[in-house]
Amino acid sequence: MAIQPLRLDPITVLGKQLVIELFDCVDQRFDDIQWIEESMLEAARQANATIITSAFHKFSPIGISGVVVIAESHLAIHTWPEYGYAAVDVFTCGDVLDGAQAVRVLSERLGSRRHLISSMDRGLGGHRLGLLSRSLAGNGPVDEDSPTLRWALGQGTGVA
């Protein structure tokens, strides 16, 4: 019997990834590894994630990279304090995690004045991308009521 290729129509979503760009981060602890790790753990807790472990590394002279491994997948961060910039990924394989809450916690704790959030459905057959929320003109909070953000988090249709 010949093996038949798996047919996908068009994508079998296995997880959702939020890609968060945090700009103009002004908190003075932005290069403090313990504070960044605690911020990431707090974001995971407030997002209802089940924390498994975490690992963080401080670069010389500045910058931090780290990951919080959760039962639902992971949260990762890479900081560039010299630019006031952080790149954050929140990936979840289930529908329990509140990604908007994780983003809100990190944006507030890092003192981000501008942000850009994109979403990607990931899985078998490819991926889908979407822009969720942006505050590139200055000091705007994460818009958790955005129809696009609700859609990306599996909470709505994405239509206003």
UniProtKB/Swiss-Prot annotation:
Cofactor: pyruvate
UniProt keyword annotations, A-Z: Autocatalytic cleavage, Decarboxylase, Lyase, Polyamine biosynthesis, Pyruvate, S-adenosyl-L-methionine, Schiff base, Spermidine biosynthesis, Zymogen
A Gene Ontology biological process term: spermidine biosynthetic process
Active site (catalytic residues): 73 (schiff-base intermediate with substrate), 78 (proton acceptor), 93 (proton donor)
Cofactor stoichiometry and binding remark: Binds 1 pyruvoyl group covalently per subunit.
GO (cellular component) term, any one: cytosol
Spans through the membrane: none
Pfam family, one: AdoMet_dc
Quaternary state and interactors: Heterotetramer of two alpha and two beta chains arranged as a dimer of alpha/beta heterodimers.
Protein role: Catalyzes the decarboxylation of S-adenosylmethionine to S-adenosylmethioninamine (dcAdoMet), the propylamine donor required for the synthesis of the polyamines spermine and spermidine from the diamine putrescine.
Designated name of the protein: S-adenosylmethionine decarboxylase proenzyme
